[in-house]
């Protein structure tokens, strides 16, 4: 992944951020192709991701930058950042350390709808979120 300042500025100029200054980012395992999660990025988090090659997102609920894995240790090393044809969605190809999902699964897409409409777990639990983040009160 090229991280020159000119390349970063070029990408930031092409991305179509929404009215809140955000763009959706789909995150995919670089080896398996498995979709791990979807998160939001703003200009600052995208620039930081390109610079450090570690995924950084924007938390809409906390209204702050969110370095993926900062609390849990489940970091995402970024190999590639792709942009879709409309310029309004990103795809990050990453090496995921541990689970990507905050509830402990490898992927945030850990539930599958069955024919009868129920949900079944279809992924691996990687960690206990209470041990990593503490109990919610």
Swiss-Prot record:
One of its GO terms (molecular function) is phosphoribosyl-AMP cyclohydrolase activity. Its cofactor is Mg(2+); Zn(2+). It comes from the Bacteria. SUPFAM superfamilies: HisI-like. Pfam families: PRA-CH. Pathway: Amino-acid biosynthesis; L-histidine biosynthesis; L-histidine from 5-phospho-alpha-D-ribose 1-diphosphate: step 3/9. Zn(2+) binds at residues 85, 101, 108. Its main location: cytoplasm. InterPro entries: PRA-CH, PRib_AMP_CycHydrolase_dom, PRib_AMP_CycHydrolase_sf. It is an enzyme of class 3 (hydrolase). Mg(2+) binds at residues 84, 86, 88. GO terms for biological process: L-histidine biosynthetic process. Belongs to the PRA-CH family. Homodimer. This is Phosphoribosyl-AMP cyclohydrolase. It comes from Chlorobium chlorochromatii (strain CaD3). The gene is hisI.
């Amino acid at each position: 992944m090229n991280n020159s300042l000119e390349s970063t500025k070029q990408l930031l100029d092409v991305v179509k951020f929404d009215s809140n200054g955000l763009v959706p980012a789909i995150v995919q395992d670089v080896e398996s192709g498995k979709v791990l999660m979807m998160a939001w990025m703003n200009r600052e988090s995208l620039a930081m991701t390109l610079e450090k090659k570690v995924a950084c997102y924007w938390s809409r609920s906390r209204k702050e930058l969110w370095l993926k894995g900062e609390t849990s240790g489940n970091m995402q090393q970024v190999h590639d950042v792709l942009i879709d044809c409309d310029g309004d969605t990103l795809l990050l190809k990453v090496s995921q350390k541990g689970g990507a999902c905050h509830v402990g699964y490898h992927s945030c897409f850990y539930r599958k709808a069955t024919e009868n409409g129920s949900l079944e777990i279809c992924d691996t639990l990687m960690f206990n979120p209470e041990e990593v983040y503490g109990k919610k009160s």
